[in-house]
Amino acid sequence: MKNYKAIGKIGEGTFSEVMKMQSLRDGNYYACKQMKQHFESIEQVNSLREIQALRRLNPHPNILALHEVVFDRKSGSLALICELMDMNIYELIRGRRHPLSEKKIMLYMYQLCKSLDHMHRNGIFHRDVKPENILVKQDVLKLGDFGSCRSVYSKQPYTEYISTRWYRAPECLLTDGFYTYKMDLWSAGCVFYEIASLQPLFPGVNELDQISKIHDVIGTPCQKTLTKFKQSRAMSFDFPFKKGSGIPLLTANLSPQCLSLLHAMVAYDPDERIAAHQALQHPYFQVQRAAETQTLAKHRRAFCPKFSMVPESSSHNWSFSQEGRKQKQSLRHEEGHARRQGPTSLMELPKLRLSGMTKLSSCSSPALRSVLGTGANGKVPVLRPLKCAAVNKKTDTQKDIKPHLKHYHLPTINRKGGEY
């Protein structure tokens, strides 16, 4: 840590201590997560789930950025140098007399769902989504503290006592570790309500009280749902029937779309609970999606000025010349003939082994038939493989091609589904 100067303590948890540090190299401020665990080797450090997750998920605008990993072999100490944010969600809402505006709530929740979607698409679920682990800096929200994360493909059962009790999903409370990434959406729903109302949704004092608080609000589940929870604990599933009072409307300024998304995120049955990618398409985020699309369009015009000169309507009104239509019909005929001949054999690409510096070697390509025209001798020239040397030289065959170039209008190729 010789390259950093300690400024002050930010917070402390069970497994780590977070300090505000200043880099002596660039002068910038960072958050240093000093691990309390002793590490024996660099292999043990690299196998740490939090480091693996941050490396896989970065860069992303809503995932806390990992700047550097500092490991001292002699002392066995490990520190994660991350970007410094202003505060976490708990600090943001603590002591507030009035809730945030719905516009601000919508902005934060959209970014939280973006972070969850990115994480789940990359095969990771967090398992400890709570206000303390969600960081903000002005209008930017980032998810941090991946110390409890797991792979969505790892074998169940998982650790039973995971995530903070107030944000723990029913399947985590009622099973011996049989839960999925959908638990993150339940936790995010609880955070959603807390940001909007400044009050926790299910503040249970113990596990039994926690499940009771859930039933008080959303009611007891049907037997079909309970049978999905495998390997139940000693806790009895003979719950007295409760209809549920419904989610308390402590704030009158919440829109129907807001409440609709909130109910979808805290669905009792994880199979019926909304996923992160589905939440991003919810009507509640319509304004955010429109703003995001507009921003992307501005960036494209800034980086590709020629696109801004083309009228928008022309992008959907493609016209072909008469010669182009003929070539397109010819191309379709050739493709149909090729399909009748049977599928071509596919070659599997060799797997890359990246270790240190990777050397790239060139290989010769097979001879290709020219599409430029015939040579001086009346025969179709063949382009032979070129070997890279200090000076590129043209072959005699290539020299013959140049004065006899023939121009062709190549047909436009239609891409299915807009893929490139």
UniProtKB/Swiss-Prot annotation:
Entries under PROSITE patterns matching the protein: PROTEIN_KINASE_ATP, PROTEIN_KINASE_DOM, PROTEIN_KINASE_ST
Keywords for this protein: ATP-binding, Cell projection, Cytoplasm, Kinase, Magnesium, Metal-binding, Nucleotide-binding, Nucleus, Phosphoprotein, Serine/threonine-protein kinase, Transferase
Activity regulation, short description: Phosphorylation appears to increase the enzymatic activity.
Basic and acidic residues bias (residue ranges): 323-338
Source taxon at top rank: Eukaryota
Cofactor(s) for this UniProt protein: Mg(2+)
Database matches in SMART domains: S_TKc (SM00220)
Post-translational modification: Autophosphorylated.
Reported impact of residue 159 to A: Loss of activity
EC number: 2.7.11.22
Pfam families: Pkinase
Effect of residue 161 to F: Loss of activity
Binding site for ATP: 10-18, 33
Ranges where the record places region Disordered: 311-344
Active site (catalytic residues): 128 (proton acceptor)
Subcellular location: Cytoplasm; Cell projection, Cilium; Nucleus
Polar residues bias (residue ranges): 311-322
Tissue specificity field: Highly expressed in testis, and less in kidney, brain and lung.
Molecular-function GO term, any one: metal ion binding
Gene Ontology, cellular component aspect: ciliary base; cilium; cytoplasm; nucleus
Primary role: Able to phosphorylate several exogenous substrates and to undergo autophosphorylation. Negatively regulates cilium length in a cAMP and mTORC1 signaling-dependent manner.
Family: Belongs to the protein kinase superfamily. CMGC Ser/Thr protein kinase family. CDC2/CDKX subfamily.
Protein name from the UniProt record: MAPK/MAK/MRK overlapping kinase
Organism: Mus musculus (Mouse)
Taxonomic path: Eukaryota, Metazoa, Chordata, Craniata, Vertebrata
